[in-house]
């Protein structure tokens, strides 16, 4: 069996031991990206990828390919419908980065409400030490308690964001096509999209990219 690993540095910054794959056959790794992905896949049985885009036309040039593994949560880099038509299974890692991404969403919120990077730069520039009253105030911090966060997509990542937001004393309005009653409490409830948009102080998008969710938030 031949295994091709595209986007090697992005998939493995160092902690994954690829040598275990050697037990299953020939393993070929590529570190750079090219437009002609089909030439890299070639006669491989299995391909692992992260950012490389694979179209149906690419897959048609790889008749030996039997399995595609997307080492990420999102799999829009692969023409899944085309792969299905050709009988090639496509797998992803649905729980990858769940905690980290929810944490990052809250980190961005704290940056917006406190301008941490700006004030850090000003302190390092010496502004605090040179101020006559040892204090400067360019942006008023926004307290999160009793503010409302709208979460569009209360799945794995949305639930992490919701949990942390509630820990800050925020109320959560959630919009999701699938509603889990176990997630509803005095600080978190489901609602329709228009109500969420009209009543949220901040909105977090945690829904997957499907045709029906593309451009979900627009100028209107």
Where do the model's predicted regions map?
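N-terminal glycine-/charge-rich "phosphate-binding" loop or analogous flexible N-terminal tail
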Residues: 1-44, 173
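Short beta->alpha connector loops at strand-helix junctions that form conserved
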Residues: 31, 71-72, 88-99, 194
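Rossmann-like adenosine-cofactor binding region
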Residues: 54-59, 173, 177-220
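Rossmann-fold NAD(P)-binding glycine/threonine-rich loop
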Residues: 76-88
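Phosphate-binding beta-alpha-beta segment of Rossmann-like dinucleotide-binding domains, i.e.
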Residues: 86, 94-148
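Glycine-rich Rossmann-fold phosphate-binding loop(s) that bind the pyrophosphate
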Residues: 154-155
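N-terminal Rossmann-fold NAD(P) dinucleotide-binding loop
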Residues: 158-159
């Amino acid at each position: 069996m031949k295994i091709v690993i595209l986007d090697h540095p992005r998939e493995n910054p160092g902690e994954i031991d690829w040598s275990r794959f050697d037990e299953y056959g020939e393993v070929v790794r590529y570190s750079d990206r090219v437009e002609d992905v089909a030439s890299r896949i070639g006669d491989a049985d299995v391909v692992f990828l992260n950012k490389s885009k694979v179209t149906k036309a690419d897959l048609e040039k790889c008749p030996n390919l039997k399995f595609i593994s997307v080492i990420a949560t999102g799999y829009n880099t692969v023409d899944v419908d085309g792969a299905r038509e050709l009988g090639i299974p496509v797998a992803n890692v649905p729980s990858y980065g769940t905690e980290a991404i929810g944490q990052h969403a809250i980190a961005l919120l704290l940056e917006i409400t406190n301008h941490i990077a700006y004030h850090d730069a000003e302190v390092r520039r010496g502004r605090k030490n040179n101020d006559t009253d040892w204090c400067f105030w360019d942006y008023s911090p926004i307290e999160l308690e009793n503010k409302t966060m709208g979460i569009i997509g209360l799945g794995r990542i949305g639930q992490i964001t919701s949990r942390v937001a509630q820990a800050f004393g925020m109320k959560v309005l959630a919009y999701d096509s699938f509603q889990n009653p176990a997630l509803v409490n005095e600080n978190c409830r489901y609602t329709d999209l228009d109500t969420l948009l009209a009543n949220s102080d901040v909105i977090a998008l945690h829904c997957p990219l499907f045709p029906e969710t593309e451009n979900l938030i627009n100028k209107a």
